[in-house]
């Protein structure tokens, strides 16, 4: 059994070693951790069985010796008068007790420790824990969830109950604190206090929570509350040196505030109201619109616009393959024209593509607009891989299908990109095409700019994960087996800035997509230029 478990563990290690860190960016890779942990539990249970068997032997020996020594000690000389008893005493002390010593000293934990030590090389890192915590906070902000809701696991579309303990919530707050995110530190440390006050058992103490919380509210400008929390901390732990120093510092600042002249009163009035904190100003100008659309709010699909949207059978410019079996086409938006196609990929094709892509998944990157260098970014949380037609016949088949549907050639298109989104996986608002003020992103390809995007949804998503267009007020929800298509460039070759779009954070579920980006070269006669710059 030990050999079997070790071999199985090593098989999982082989998978995990290819993944390396950043597990939180791909649910597909996190599933490997589930199975690895399951095997680790099996190894632990085997260790427990061995320890229990060993302890059972020791207990049996102890009980036997207790009965024997009680009898022999009651009449030592009478007991030893029997020569057999004398022999057995000598034998026990010379042979049996050393054998028991060997049993006690047996290190049955060695196998388990060896397995654990090997596997720890492939465990998630501090970066993963921080990334997963930030993902939960991203979901908290985007979908307006309070920490209590998340802690209770009350999320839409969930199949399994999952709750955060006091220690889990403390970990969330500490991760935020270490990132200098005092807004979320306060929210999560307050949740910790609520659960502690409710009587939940934990290793985390109120003193620890108040230590973080008092400094966080101070950083948010709430001096009065920082002082009150510090006093609470000292009432619980009078010997807390840092709290003592902070108390004196806060009292000094408060005294200086009280001594402000009337001319500076306006400044004092502008201080943060006690206990009320606002989310910091974000770097993304359209943040509010983007997040509203992710929640299904603010969609500008008016009745008038809806009347211009239709469903039809699409024959792909009368391609022979589609004349026999046309695709169902549905208008998602009128201008720019965004369409959805149904039954583009079968379940079998999807599973095969995921199977091929999974070993190749790596953290998705973005191209720095100033340097042109590919780099990871916090606003794109997913893993992706690129599939060639030689990888499997299904890739070539899907490529041909996209060519027939769009009427564009795939000869100059990019490889099929497969992406899997992790915890709170997202891709904030971006353009698929290269802008004039950037380095020529696609110069090395020699095929021009990205003229069109074909996005395949390869999974349903229980909650979240929409594709939204902030400038349009459009939101498109994932449906397994469907695909959406739009042109990134006007017929003049100029970029259509209305196509700025985003992949909303996945609230519940596992999101798989694949992208095919068509380029300008080769499309000259398939999508001719327009007569004006705005065509």
From Swiss-Prot:
Record field: catalytic activity: L-prolyl-[collagen] + 2-oxoglutarate + O2 = trans-4-hydroxy-L-prolyl-[collagen] + succinate + CO2
Expression (tissue specificity): Expressed in the heart, placenta, lung and pancreas.
GO molecular function: electron transfer activity; iron ion binding; L-ascorbic acid binding; procollagen-proline 4-dioxygenase activity
EC top class named in words: oxidoreductase
Cofactors (names): Fe(2+); L-ascorbate
Mutation effect (residue 150 to V): In MYP25; uncertain significance
Pfam families according to UniProt: 2OG-FeII_Oxy_3, P4Ha_N, TPR_P4H
Keywords: Dioxygenase, Disease variant, Endoplasmic reticulum, Glycoprotein, Iron, Metal-binding, Oxidoreductase, Signal, TPR repeat, Vitamin C
Segment forming the signal sequence: 1-21
Domain of life: Eukaryota
Organism for this UniProt entry: Homo sapiens
Recorded coiled-coil stretches: none
All copies of domain Fe2OG dioxygenase, residue ranges: 412-520
The protein's assembly and partners: Heterotetramer of two alpha-2 chains and two beta chains (P4HB) (the beta chain is the multi-functional PDI), where P4HB plays the role of a structural subunit; this tetramer catalyzes the formation of 4-hydroxyproline in collagen.
Gene that this sequence comes from: P4HA2
Residues involved in Fe cation binding: 430, 432, 501
TPR repeat spans: 207-240
Name of the protein in its database record: Prolyl 4-hydroxylase subunit alpha-2
Activity regulation info: Inhibited by poly(L-proline) only at very high concentrations.
